Amino acid sequence: MQKNTASEFMMTFVQEYLDGKRSRLDFDLDFSHYLMKHYAKMDRENPDLTECFNFYLAEEGFDQAEGLSDDRHRKLIQKQFNKFKAALRDGFF
């Protein structure tokens, strides 16, 4: 993946949350905003990668996290991020 891409921005955003550099409130408020803002550019850069990110992090992560405790929220996002990164490692993109 090229450096300084919209996809890289979104991956860094998620990783900062998982590393404790962003609060859950910040993550919850900003995730959808940033995804909408960067989605078109991500899709131009790599449509398959964008669809994978959207599936694992938005649909199966963020959208399923409502009502979870902070700890369970972070664990769910970590699990989904790991699945996304595994798809990257397996060379699907």
Model-based region annotation:
Residues M1-F93:
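Acidic, Ser/Pro/Thr-rich low-complexity regulatory regions
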